[in-house]
């Protein structure tokens, strides 16, 4: 796989930003095992892509630093796009940058222009962990014409409960964090509440992304994942939910990002 760090100006964010990108390319073991890699450079080849979102306190390089996702993706010839979004919850912030607009619309359009990524909905996916799990579902439901599948690992899926202090780590967030996100943190618009957003899309007859969520049985986000699965299922969404032993940590995410990749390819 080819590893690229791409810096560019984002109109949505109104600042320079950085994206880490992994593109399919020959690897040393291909040579050692005698595999034919000429098809990787076929004229007009456009890769399927997975946008991978980080969690709170983190950045776009975390997936590369703490997991083997680059190696896992090599098997599927899948491009990985890993943006940085600070502690934005991937929303268009009240006092801050418009990360939802950036992730759901500007970034895919930019990536497809600069790199050989497919512009087909069925070839474009998004996933994330913790805050990024929420961001992945939010982006996919905001722009279902772009993303055909979305996956969440240990997702912080209940934004209203989170902002009301119903999760233990909210007290650890920076001062004025909530005020930067929303004008009124106790009155979150439906466009940022996943069940409400999903219900609105379903009522409008919109095409919906297929959803996958996975959570550890010792994870503090487990109740929120249980509730979202029940709500999404009741709305008729195509949703799969897996629970495994584990907590809110990289051991869980490194293991179960492999499940996400298998699900994307219909192997799960």
Enumerate the predicted regions with their spans:
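Non-catalytic cap/lid and distal C-terminal segments of serine-dependent acyl enzymes
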Residues: 1-268
């Amino acid at each position: 796989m080819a590893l690229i760090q791409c810096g560019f100006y984002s109109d949505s964010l109104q600042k320079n930003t950085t994206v880490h990108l992994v593109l399919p390319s020959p690897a040393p073991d291909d040579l050692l095992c005698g595999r034919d890699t000429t098809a990787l450079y076929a004229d007009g080849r456009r890769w399927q892509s997975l946008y991978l979102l980080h969690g709170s306190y983190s950045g776009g390089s975390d997936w590369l630093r703490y997991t083997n996702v680059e190696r896992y993706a090599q098997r599927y010839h899948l491009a990985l796009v890993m943006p940085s979004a600070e502690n934005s919850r991937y929303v268009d912030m009240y006092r801050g940058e418009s990360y939802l607009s950036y992730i759901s619309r500007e970034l895919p359009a930019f990536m497809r222009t600069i790199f050989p990524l497919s512009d087909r909905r069925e070839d474009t996916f998004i996933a994330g962990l913790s805050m990024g799990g929420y961001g992945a579902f939010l982006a996919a439901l905001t722009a279902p014409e772009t993303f055909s599948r979305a996956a969440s690992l240990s997702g912080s899926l209940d934004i209203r409960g989170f902002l009301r202090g119903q999760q233990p780590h909210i007290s650890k967030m920076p001062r004025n964090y909530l005020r930067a996100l929303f004008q009124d943190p106790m009155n979150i618009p439906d466009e940022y509440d996943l069940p409400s957003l999903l219900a609105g899309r379903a009522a409008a007859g919109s095409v919906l992304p297929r959803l996958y969520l996975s959570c550890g049985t010792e994870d503090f986000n487990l109740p929120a994942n249980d509730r979202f699965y029940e709500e999404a299922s009741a709305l008729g969404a195509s949703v799969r939910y897996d629970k495994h032993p584990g907590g809110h940590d990289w051991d869980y995410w490194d293991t179960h990002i492999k499940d996400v990749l298998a699900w994307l390819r219909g192997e799960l």
